[in-house]
Amino acid sequence: MKVRLLRQLSAAAKVKAPSGLQGPPQAHQFISLLLEEYGALCQAARSISTFLGTLENEHLKKFQVTWELHNKHLFENLVFSEPLLQSNLPALVSQIRLGTTTHDTCSEDTYSTLLQRYQRSEEELRRVAEEWLECQKRIDAYVDEQMTMKTKQRMLTEDWELFKQRRFIEEQLTNKKAVTGENNFTDTMRHMLSSRLSMPDCPNCNYRRRCACDDCSLSHILTCGIMDPPVTDDIHIHQLPLQVDPAPDYLAERSPPSVSSASSGSGSSSPITIQQHPRLILTDSGSAPTFCSDDEDVAPLSAKFADIYPLSNYDDTEVVANMNGIHSELNGGGENMALKDESPQISSTSSSSSEADDEEADGESSGEPPGAPKEDGVLGSRSPRTEESKADSPPPSYPTQQAEQAPNTCECHVCKQEASGLTPSAMTAGALPPGHQFLSPEKPTHPALHLYPHIHGHVPLHTVPHLPRPLIHPTLYATPPFTHSKALPPAPVQNHTNKHQVFNASLQDHIYPSCFGNTPEWNSSKFISLWGSEVMNDKNWNPGTFLPDTISGSEILGPTLSETRPEALPPPSSNETPAVSDSKEKKNAAKKKCLYNFQDAFMEANKVVMATSSATSSVSCTATTVQSSNSQFRVSSKRPPSVGDVFHGISKEDHRHSAPAAPRNSPTGLAPLPALSPAALSPAALSPASTPHLANLAAPSFPKTATTTPGFVDTRKSFCPAPLPPATDGSISAPPSVCSDPDCEGHRCENGVYDPQQDDGDESADEDSCSEHSSSTSTSTNQKEGKYCDCCYCEFFGHGGPPAAPTSRNYAEMREKLRLRLTKRKEEQPKKMDQISERESVVDHRRVEDLLQFINSSETKPVSSTRAAKRARHKQRKLEEKARLEAEARAREHLHLQEEQRRREEEEDEEEEEDRFKEEFQRLQELQKLRAVKKKKKERPSKDCPKLDMLTRNFQAATESVPNSGNIHNGSLEQTEEPETSSHSPSRHMNHSEPRPGLGADGDAADPVDTRDSKFLLPKEVNGKQHEPLSFFFDIMQHHKEGNGKQKLRQTSKASSEPARRPTEPPKATEGQSKPRAQTESKAKVVDLMSITEQKREERKVNSNNNNKKQLNHIKDEKSNPTPMEPTSPGEHQQNSKLVLAESPQPKGKNKKNKKKKGDRVNNSIDGVSLLLPSLGYNGAILAHCNLRLPGSSDCAASASQVVGITDDVFLPKDIDLDSVDMDETEREVEYFKRFCLDSARQTRQRLSINWSNFSLKKATFAAH
């Protein structure tokens, strides 16, 4: 019908064009046809409806739909509303009107009659459209109801675990002789479990409807306080519902350790029972909420969980005030406040704290006895106004229609999502201001504590991308240490900055404490004590407990990202609350601090972020200490090496890029990332502190640590915003450890491009083949082809001599030699102090001082004496250059400071604008809340939701627009660009992309600029590895494939399923497509790696052995990088590999040798390194690095890959021709030593159960070196 009409219309248009005289007749013809079609349809519908009596009477009638109405609606919707038709109708009608006036061939009557018919039909169709809207609402409501019923049934049948739990609790209760004090608890519990406690009977909460599943039952029990006796309605307003003496902490006994009350609405709430942290209770601060430092802080909660936990149902005034971050003005003055007196409070601070506990805690903190009247002992947030309203206002009558609302409707998160028809974005997307809790446009949900998140809202593997993550991750119970004794204090969010403690569904703040105290003056000692405690000491500490989903790939990007660097990636769905621009701006725009600068990355004066994401590597992170002075955050003891990446400069003052510490190209960690990007990566992971400030926080640390899982390579790739491609100068794209961010202060490279001029290359011709900027097989003509390998290993251990001489493998002896040399150096140290002090102005030697002393030996090396002279000259040149660089660095720093100031001002402006947005939004929301309360449930979704949705989106857009502006130059574009630009910021990728395959992947994905790099890199790497069984390498690849392919937690590493999950899921939140892309990329890359390996193998067979020695060394190194120390910055690898291949692909034989040599060295070297480093004073990063490889983490290939993923780039040698590049003498020697250490550390393979039989088969060829 539609086609016929449109055909007629187009034909009429063609005819009408040439001769306007035919206009009215054609209009008449078309309108007549339209009306005839409509009439025919209506007639047919009426005829057919006689046969559809059953359908109409039994089904359609309940929606007040008739078959005829349905057909009319279809006509109106599909035909009459057709844009083409609508655009032409006015013209046609005007033609008909024209026909009534001009006496055409047809009589006037014909036109006027037709016009009247048309107008009647149009009116009828408009009525039909309106009627259908009403019917549609009814149909939607019915569908919602059916869906909730089905979901409820499905849950009841599926969740056997809950039934078991319930049975267990019942048995426990019935068998246990209750102490008299516990009788009340036991009875209540049994009652609740057995009768499912019809909600109207619940004396403690006004919530009338609840999902019947056991999860909800238990949640209700936990939330409403089991031991509270029923409170009668006539209870005196001031009478306290609970007994004054704190009841035994039943909940603490029975509930899983770190479950915090789901009701806790503040972004920073944590499972801290108040008694344990009385300091958390602030003093009366007017009407400021206690745990939310500002109204804004709570917004995310309402945004994320309004649909899950309508906070308006809380009984306690304090809870309402605190949790919602709004005061008695909302919700009818003190009504909600009064609720508290009507019934026992639901403690929001902790699942285990009862009101009595709160009172006790308050008493403690304020110096009052626990029994003090509640008005006095109130949490600090209660303002006098609150108390007045509480005392004066009568108990609110809960809106009746709410009580009557479908009692059988399932209130679980998923059902609610479906039933409301709202995209969670409406609720979740914008950080809705606190008022939203009251208005939850959908059916209010139970403010319950869900013990079984997989039931509520957790869709397996997150197949439904829009749903928020599970409330508590299944690994919740994995780590007791985190629970009672050392609960973390809520984050010290400062009102102005922490606008949005993102309460992302995935990162439930109410469960994963924001690890810092709420008080601005919070001192680091608390942090130290917390983290120095069992939490950090627990070797198997599972970050999953408090970061359950945070690290899962997308979450890190999504929630966490939204948390810390909202702008880094556009939130995939409104699943992530738009991050507050100021948080990201603070770090991001204010001063693009190079991520190397550790404390910058981790904190801004008062904001401390736990680098504990490092814990994710499951390495024991013992004392992670925070030095409050200078807000400098140091991880002083064993922290997974990856944290070391961030340590490029420890303090702001010394943020200069030190040559030895992090040579330009050295794999110092995060390499060219524009300063903030990694922060985005690990933000959440790192910081259970959702304080946005911490946007920068330990991102760098996380990407490497948590990502140790093999499967992570991919994910991490996609979840690390790709660095912006640095400009390239000549063939070298930004050296990996050179920050490509032109604004990064203290770097010696301008515009992220390494300026070859900076190193004079005059005498570099014959220098070591291990120099920074050239790769082992550098094609540079100045490298002597026939020279034997002069790498650190060969030089130091004397196996660079005539080819016939077999290399010594007496590692014990080597270690001894090293030890002796070290002691000698230490004796000589005083002499060299002057020289070092000169350098200190430019370079921060604190971390490698001893190492440099050790390597800067005047002692003749076993190789050639001419080289010593050359080094001396080189050193002299370098000293001069360093003075120049120092001046430049100072100038740059000055510029940075100015720019930072400017950015701060911009941020403040943006902050103000954001505040205005929030206020406006909150006002609108409050209005809507009031309206919503009056409306019936069925009307609410259809009418309020659209508005909320719109508001939410506006708000989200507003908040996001700000972040995004600052974001771009900071590298948030990196996320999307990642695959293409990966080679530009290789080191970052390496850090993030765990297994070497990741490196290959990076290379492959690299954009054209670096394709050659990546090509070389892969082949070389692969060649080095492929000829051998390289079970390690392939293990990694396999894990990687599995992890990515399945998106499953394939990780075998100790970090438990949680870390594994993080790696694989990161992309999900980052971008809708991020995940698939990353995974396919990683798979493709692995495949590429294999194919390239094959090609190169062929190629290398053909190649001559001229460079065998050198290449051998480098390949060895490179391979070592790929394997035991994978993270070496890709840039490094790429450059090296580039050179390696360029000069001459390596012969296969050599690779084998390398393998073997590598294999043998690995074990002893580990010991050597571990022995040496401590004595060197290389405490932090190197030790972590070495420890990582020691037995603790070498359980299986996966954990090895984990180790590999985290290795500190700083400690990986650069595969470059040291001779062909002008590099500081010190740097060169550092490289030598790194090589030695790296080779030694490779012994880890043995512990990984590598099949050594293959290596032994090649012994014969090995001597041929």
Swiss-Prot record:
Region annotated Disordered sits at 247-272, 331-407, 553-586, 626-674, 750-785, 822-841, 859-881, 893-1163
Q: Basic residues bias located where?
A: 868-877, 931-940, 1149-1159
Acidic residues compositional bias, start-end: 355-365, 757-769
Looking up InterPro entries in the UniProt record yields: FAM193 (IPR029717), FAM193_C (IPR031802)
Recorded coiled-coil stretches: 107-142, 873-932, 1093-1118
Keywords associated with the record: Coiled coil, Phosphoprotein
Which protein, by its recorded name, is this?
Answer: Protein FAM193A
Give me the gene this protein comes from.
Answer: FAM193A
